[in-house]
Structures are given as C-alpha cells and as structure tokens.
Amino acid sequence: MAATALDHLSLGGKIQWLAQLNTEFQPAREFRRTSIICTIGPKTNSVEAINKLRDAGLNVVRMNFSHGSYEYHQSVIDNARQAEKVHPGRPIAIALDTKGPEIRTGNTKNDEDIPISAGTILNITTDEKYKDECTIEHMYVDYVNITKVIAPGRIIYVDDGVLAFEVLEIVDDKTIKVKARNNGYISSRKGVNLPNTDVDLPALSEKDKADLRFGVKNKVDMVFASFIRRGQDIKDIREVLGEDGKQIQIIAKIENRQGLNNFAEILAETDGVMVARGDLGIEIPAAEVFAAQKKIIAMCNIAGKPVICATQMLESMIKNPRPTRAEISDVGNAVTDGADCVMLSGETAKGAYPTEAVREMSEAVLKAENTIPYVSHFEELCSLAKRPVSIVESCAMASVRASLDLNAAAILVLSTSGESARLISKYRPVCPIIMITRNDSASRYAHLYRGVYPFLFPESKPDFSKVNWQEDVDRRIKWGLSHGIGLKVLNEGETVVVVQGWKGGMGNTNTFRIVKADVNHLGLGQP
C-alpha cells in the first residue's frame, strides 16, 4: 500500500493496485480526507461533548428537525459555535436536516418503548387524541390521508423497517386495522414508510418553511433536504432561503423511487446529495440500495458535487462499545465508492458510546482511503470532464496533475467562495487541500468537499488602493503554510502547490505556483 504520489504513479490499474495492498501499512503522516457528520442529541448537546466529538473526528454538526424544539436546536447551535472557539480558525459546520414530507408516529407515554409481538392486532390512527398517548392498541401517525392512499394487503414499515405491519382493514377515515409481522417496540416519533404508495404530501410543509427561516436567521451552513423527489423541490427550498440564505448549501436526500428516477434533474439543481439509505432501503428493495449508492456517488463524483453516505453505518454502537466487522466494511465501501462525507445518526445522538463511534469511524475511513488508486481515479475523472471546462476547473485539474508529478505534500488554495477548492477536490489529489478563505460561511461548508482542510483567515479584506494585492496574497499563503505545519498536515521544507486568483473575488482562480514550506521564514521562492 502506497502513501505518496510517486508510489501511486508507479502502479497501473485498479486490480494491480489492490493486489499490492499491505494491510499492515502505516503511512508516515495520516490525514483524513473524508468528513464525518455527527447528529447531536441530548447526550452530546454540550460544549464539552461536542469538543470531544471534534477531537475524535467530527467536522459537521447535524440537527434533526424531525425532533426537538427551536429552543433545543438553538442550544445546539450555540454550543457548536462555542466549541469552535476552542480552536479558532478551525471551523465546525452546522447542518439543518428538515423533516420534509415524511410520516412519523406519535409519542408514547413518558417516551417508553412498548414491546409488541408478531401477530398483534392494533389500530394505526390519525386521531389527535392518541398523538401523545400511543399504546399497544392505538398507534398514532401524522399523515391525515393515510386511509385514502393505503389498501388491505399493503405493508406499513416503522422505524427504518424495524417494525412491519400488514394492513387488514380500512376501518374508517381515521383508522386502519393492522397486524404486526414481527416482534419489536412501539417508540416515540419513529419514521413511517408506505412503499409502492403515492403519498400526496407537499415537498415543503409549513413547518419546513419555518425551520428553514430559523436556519437562515441562525446562519446554518447547509440544509439536508429530506425526501427530494424532483429538481423543482430544490428551487422551492432556495426560494424560501432567499437572499439572506443564498450561501447555505442544499443537500438533496434521496430516499425514494421517485428521487432515484429523477436523480439527473435533482443533481443539476442541488449543491450536493445524501444517500439516505434508511428510508431508501424501505421504499425500494434493500438489495437495490447497494447499486443505488454506487450509482448516486459515481454521478456526483463526475459532476464534482459532494455526496454523503448515511444511515446505520455504525448502528450497533448505539449500545455496544465496538462496531461489527460488517459495519466497518460498510464505512470503508462508502469511502472507496467515492463519498465525500459519512454520517452518524443515533450513534452520536443517543448512543452509549458517541465519542468511540466517531473514533472508530475515523479509523475506518483512514484505512479505506489508503486503498484507493488515486492516479487512475484522477485520469478517469479528467477523461469524463465535459469539454470545454471552465478556466477555474482547468486550473484545478492542472494543480492536481502538478501535485502528482511533484509528489507535493499539499495543495494550498486561496478561495473566496470555496468553488476552486471544490473543483480541486473533484479530481481527488493524493495530498490534502488546504483552503484559506475570508468567507466565514465557505470556511464551514467546505467540510463537504473531500480532502479539504478549510481555515478562516482572521484578517479582513484590505483596501487594495493602499495595500498591494500580491502582498496580501503572500501573507495569506504564509499564514496557511504555518497553520498546515502547526496541524501536522505539512512538514517543514515540503513542496506545496499554491492555487490563487489573479485578482480578488469569485471566479478569478487561474494561477498556480510551487513553494516550499519553511516554518522559520516561509519563503515563497521556487524550490
């Protein structure tokens, strides 16, 4: 197994590369390219807990708006922002995951888990009096039209398919008689799926719109948009976010057959994609999710848009201190498929071992990243790029090629919006991408891009009528090199490819040069 660009260049295609793997290989310097998203729940909603997760590998904090009050979510945002201050310049991104057009059960009394046995007959109801009083006889769901779209013989799944109910009879306009097909528990606020059923829910509910406005007010960095079914859904979300939320990245969650069928138009509109395997694995046969994951990730890689793999990645660690071998392989396969980020849900929101789960995921990601044949991957992505490419993308491709030929330790990019960093990330260099920006929002959402280490430059933009443009550029480069060395992403004296614009502002990246990292004076001469 190789660590440097020269090692990668010495081997041929994927099969030859994999045949050379050394399972005991330890690179001289490890850096993780794939970001880790952690859902924050009551067990981890504190500055101390978030910093523990961060030290273990957290990059993005996720808030699930299917649960919790605005007061609770405000506390998550406040705690994440406070935790970020412990390491100034190292941003923590904040993601708002919408409820979307989903269906959920009501609450059980005192949030208890009610055991249920296979063969049990009960009523699924939309009667509001059971909303906070679900029992073994009556389980509330929040979709008022469920009796109109379901039919006897159909299956209703609850809690990512953990519970399955066969529809026996439509009793009245509020009640469905069902039979449990397996043992399990009736719990509070669990997701409900109706496979092979046309659900007439709007893409954005009034709650979703209010939640998005809350996100804009609190300057969240990204929105994970649930149950996206068509490209127009993304446009509708952008309209709600408005001018004040124009920098918020929209990540389309693909969770049903309609989203899969319309994926090309969704990809054209969205900033990124999440393979939300929980609901997807119920809405389509579970065996198809494997292929769907690979297809979605590949299409995102070709488009250069970030993609997240989520759901049940280390599910057993909700209760157990160590993951299963299958879970570690699942994480590794997501990485080798090409995911930019991997996500933890219940593992960090309510699990008994949240920090350990992040640490295990980080270790699994690192090992998987070392198995990827980066050079052949780069060549294939270059061949698939639609010509003519933009000037910025051409510069990104050239900088990655230079990093391979030079065996560079890093690519350092000065970016306003993060676009140039995204395009460099698209071509998957062997080395890390150090992104320096003055854009507070971009410094956070750049965690979506594989291999990017974003840093917020602390100095405000100068008046270029008084300050030389190139002097400001050099100052940012020196600062970035210094931080790279300080975080051990770089070693003193190593070669770095620097990517920059010829003037300030977005879309002007067209130049790269080669420098040496020197911790003493950080000179910018040619190596």
From Swiss-Prot:
Positions bound to ATP: N64, F65, S66, H67, R104, K190
Residues of the site described as Transition state stabilizer: K253
Annotated keywords: ATP-binding, Glycolysis, Kinase, Magnesium, Metal-binding, Nucleotide-binding, Potassium, Pyruvate, Transferase
Residues involved in K(+) binding: N64, S66, D97, T98
Pathway: Carbohydrate degradation; glycolysis; pyruvate from D-glyceraldehyde 3-phosphate: step 5/5
Disulphide bonds in the chain: none
Binding residues for Mg(2+): E255, D279
Top-rank taxon: Eukaryota
Top enzyme category: transferase
Residues given in the record as substrate binding sites: R62, G278, D279, T311
GO cellular component, one term: cytoplasm
UniProt cofactor(s): Mg(2+); K(+)
Description of how the protein assembles with itself and partners: Homotetramer.
NCBIfam families documented for this protein: PRK05826.1, PRK06354.1, pyruv_kin
Record's protein name: Pyruvate kinase
Native organism taxonomy: Eukaryota, Fungi, Dikarya, Ascomycota, Pezizomycotina
GN (gene name): ace-8
